[in-house]
UniProtKB/Swiss-Prot annotation:
Record text about domains: Composed of three domains: an alpha/beta domain corresponding to the FAD-binding domain, a beta-domain partially modulating accessibility to the coenzyme, and an additional alpha-domain.
Name the UniProt record assigns to this protein: Aminoacetone oxidase
Keyword field: FAD, Flavoprotein, Nucleotide-binding, Oxidoreductase
UniProt GO molecular function: nucleotide binding
Residues where FAD binds: A14, E33, I134, E362, N374, I375
Length: 391
């Protein structure tokens, strides 16, 4: 039976970074992955370009991690988004920053990121075994035994980095939650996060239209980002981010011109009162959006009476949209819920119930926005879980 100091189950970003960290600290380390290649889900992030992190400050990170982000203060004090940027830069990956602080490889290829992680694992002497599905994990005395259908390994330290349950075709089947339950850990309810929104909005009229930096709001939750109208409802970063706060049955509000106040809009209409209403709004909005807003109103701006003008402005600034639901967990980008953080040491990510057992990445009850935040959480928790901690 092969013995290692540390075994990591799951070869996504958290697992690869945990392997690098563990190997860096001199541990004989094994990474086990069920797919043929490491980073299968990572390969599809950012439209295949791999939005590897976000270059914001700590407050930005906290805002980008709505699901228990404060748990990560200790993690980020050890390894944060700027350490991620330094790591890839020092390992030969040129990075660039795009809108909203999103960081990508200059190549615009996720393989660049995955290959840099794989190369570092090899350089540090980590062992990787792919195409291997784990069937059981148990602990006897001080040793964990990890078994596949035809092999077994032992270790003193076990790190579970199997991800959540979104996009199960990439390998995120929830197996890590089964391991957690086996060791008597609590797994909180799992649901879709960063999910497109299903709505009863007139989708076909606006299908395919994308808007930059509009505002979606629900109660105190206000998200300003890009939005895409689809055949089923709303997608794009604004909708994905708001999905963390709705389930279905809520009314959300869309402001397509957040940069203008209601008074600004009233002044603009008055300034262009001789124009047709459609041509007036086309100055500010895409033609099909302008068409949508002008349908119930008179043809000319100057023909609007006061109540019609107020109604038009209110529609543009506070368009009510009924949310009927979200895409299923399997079709969402992120899993909300996971291994309860009450049972995890925030400094080491070690189990409070089982010495030597650690969790990192999306298997934990932490959910972050797209835009580099979810991968940041995975990479940083992976590094910390793999590290050696001295009291």
């Amino acid at each position: 039976m092969n013995h290692f100091d540390t075994i990591i189950i799951g070869g996504g970003p958290a697992g690869m970074m945990a392997t690098i960290s563990s190997s860096f600290y001199g541990q004989k380390t094994l990474l086990l992955e069920k797919n043929k290649r490491l980073g299968k889900k990572l390969a599809g992030t950012g439209g295949g370009r791999c939005n590897v992190t976000n270059n914001g400050n700590l407050d930005d990170l906290m805002a980008g991690i709505p699901g228990n982000g404060r748990f990560l203060y200790s993690v980020f004090s050890q390894f944060d988004n700027h350490d991620i940027i330094n790591f890839f830069t020092e390992n030969g990956v040129k990075l660039k920053v795009e809108d909203h602080g999103r960081v990508f490889p200059v190549t615009d290829k996720s393989r660049t990121i995955i290959e840099a992680l794989e190369k570092k694992i090899a350089e540090l002497g980590g062992t990787v075994i792919t195409n291997t599905e784990i069937v059981s994990v148990k602990k006897t005395d001080e040793l964990f035994t990890v078994r596949s259908s035809d092999q077994a390994w032992t270790c003193q330290k076990l790190i579970v980095t199997t991800g959540g349950k979104s996009y199960p075709s990439t390998g995120s089947t929830g197996f890590g939650h089964d391991i957690a339950r086996h060791f008597k850990h609590t797994v909180t309810d799992l649901e879709a996060a960063e999910s497109p929104l299903l709505t009863d909005f007139p989708h076909k009229a606006l299908q395919g239209i994308s808007l930059d930096d509009v505002t979606l709001s629900y109660g105190k939750h206000i998200i300003t980002h890009d939005l895409l109208f689809t055949h089923f409802g709303l997608s794009g970063p604004a909708a994905l981010r708001l999905s963390s706060f709705v389930k279905g049955g809520e009314t959300i509000y869309l402001d397509v011109l957040p940069q203008m106040s209601q008074q600004d809009l009233a002044d603009f209409l008055e300034e262009h009162r001789e124009k047709s209403l459609k041509n007036c709004l086309k100055i500010l909005l895409p033609e099909r959006i302008a068409d949508f807003f002008t349908q119930p109103f008179p043809e000319k701006v100057k023909q609007l009476n006061l109540s019609e003008k107020e109604a038009l402005i209110k529609q543009i600034k506070e368009l009510p949209i009924s949310v009927t639901g979200k895409m299923s967990l399997a079709k969402s980008f992120v899993t909300k819920g996971g291994v309860s953080l009450k049972e995890i040491n925030p400094k080491t990510l070690e189990s409070k119930l089982v010495p030597g057992l650690h969790f990192a990445g999306e298997v934990l009850d932490i959910n972050a926005h797209t835009g580099g935040f979810n991968i940041t959480s995975a990479l940083c928790t992976g590094w910390v879980a793999g590290s050696l901690h001295y009291d």
